[in-house]
A protein has these predicted regions:
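Histidine-acidic metal/acid-base catalytic patches
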Residues: 9-28, 34-144
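Surface-exposed cleft-lining segments at the edges of enzyme active sites
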Residues: 1-4, 79-80
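Short, flexible loop segments at the rims of nucleotide/cofactor-binding pockets, characterized by
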Residues: 3-4, 32-34
Length: 144
């Protein structure tokens, strides 16, 4: 979490590795990835075994982040549906696929006051359609 003591994959992997437990694993999320200023590039994952990444959450982000002092507020109130922000989600999912990660779960984590304010039905449909579009582009096999 970019606003925490474990701000990026490098530190997260160091914690998991130091734990030396079979069930210690990582979850990846494009909001956290982008806000940690990590490039969407396999080089970031090169030292991490694919089986140590258990799950991914997908969403998208605004181009301009909240101020560092309130970045957590963006995380808790202003995430975007996959493919509707800076457009990082499809490339993020492609990177996961290319690494050979086989997530036990692919979750959608769109935490957005603005989207929810349009009603639960709108939020569900908007998030579903956005997610489906990204997965059809980046990793259609997971939809089968």
């Amino acid at each position: 979490m970019p606003y925490s003591g474990i701000p990026d994959m490098k530190k997260g992997w160091a914690v998991v590795k130091a734990a030396d437990c079979e069930n210690a694993k990582l979850i990846m999320d494009p909001w956290h990835w982008v806000r940690a200023n990590q490039p969407i590039d396999l080089s970031v994952l090169e030292d991490i075994p694919a089986d140590k990444i258990v799950s991914i959450q997908i969403n998208d982000v605004w181009e301009r982040p909240y101020a560092t002092t309130i970045l957590r507020d963006e995380s808790m109130h202003d995430r975007l549906a996959p493919g509707t922000g800076i457009g990082c989600t499809a490339d993020f999912v492609k990177m996961v696929k290319e690494k050979g990660i086989k997530p036990n779960a692919i979750g959608v984590e769109v935490i957005s006051d603005a989207i929810l304010a349009k009603g639960l039905e709108y939020a569900a449909n908007h998030t579903y359609e956005s997610t489906k579009k990204v997965l059809e582009e980046a990793w259609p096999e997971v939809l089968r």
